[in-house]
Amino acid sequence: MPVSPAMAEDLAREVGLLYQDAEGALLELLAKALEADIESPRWAELKLASIGNLRTAVEQVADALQQDTDGAVRRALVTAYNRGRQAAVAELGALDIGRELAARDTLPNAPAVDRLAASMADDTRPVYQRITRAVVDTYRRIVSRVSGTQLLTGITRRQASQRAMDQFANRGITGFVDSAGRRWDMASYAEMAVRSVTARAAIEGHIDALAEIRVGLVIVSDAPLECPLCRPWEGEILTLGSATGPHTVRLPNELAHGRTTVAVHVAGSLVEARAAGLFHPNCRHSLGAYLPGVTTRPPHHPTPGTTYEDTQRQREIERLIRQWKRRQAAAMDEQARTRANAKVRAWQAEMRRHVAAHPELRRKPQREQIGSAR
């Protein structure tokens, strides 16, 4: 079977749940810290005096998160790599080269897994470094803003605190920028990084297995509702070697056992395609071995009534559901909690309508949870 990023999505989701739980815990910590002694005339003074306690609690959450995710990521990478390798075995199992691959008893490529684990550590290190500072700085700003707002507007301290907490919950812990310059909140950034690195592990397991049996070409699937980044590579043949750019090669016909040759148009290298955006987070394309004379181009899948823009509207609704769930976690009283819950239900109803109106869409409840990547 071909390999695709989707092969490792469940592994990334399991790690993402750790970030999801941490994000909820941090919002609740902040809300409880602000709510304590909220009726006291010395509220602002007491809040500033308790910053040390809040910092300690946040650091405990961040340390526990890092310990849990380090081991979980390593296990996910090994599993993803093995899945990619087994996909190559399943794909070629009926052929002589497939039986040769299946007979090999090969452990995961330790250097490859180590390299990916190090890359993941580099990508997520800013998350742990920023958590404590972001939460404590937000706490200071809210205390200062609430004190000033009361004097200027006359609204209650609880109302002002809730308004500030709602704004923070809408944004999440922000300030994380990926290689493309896009800004992410903490949980979304971390899960995006996990999804990317586990997808890479699955693909590397697959291409390492192909390299062992000297298969040097792969072909990209034709996925419905593709994005502009992937569209140029759909159905194209790519080399696992270093050659770049479109070129044509003549190769032995596998069906004729090498007695004849066939012309193969190669669109570029896999490295080149990935650098251009193929297999980005959320990519639904797959990659299969290309055997001259055996492999045919994938069929096109029409999607009448559903467009790529409809998939992006689904992503937008998912973000709004997550936003209001964060507002639930940040609620300081029952009134705010009830209002946020009503908004969650309203956007969930809109999601049901949107999916029902577009037959090619499938609802993904896990992407509506706090902490799911965008």
Report residues per predicted region.
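N-terminal leader/targeting and assembly helices and adjacent pre-domain segments
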Residues: 1-169, 293-294, 301-374
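Short hydrophobic/aromatic-rich motifs at helix boundaries and adjacent loops
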Residues: 136-137, 178-179, 199
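Hydrophobic/aromatic-lined pockets within catalytic cores
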Residues: 147, 151, 169, 173, ...
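Hydrophobic alpha-helical scaffolding
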Residues: 154, 180, 184, 188, ...
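Short, glycine/acidic-rich hinge or "gate" loops at secondary-structure transitions
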Residues: 154, 158, 176, 180, ...
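Long, charged/polar-rich coiled-coil alpha-helical scaffolds that serve as structural arms
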Residues: 159, 163-166, 170-175, 192, ...
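Acidic, glycine-rich two-metal-ion catalytic cores of nucleic acid-processing enzymes
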Residues: 184-292, 300
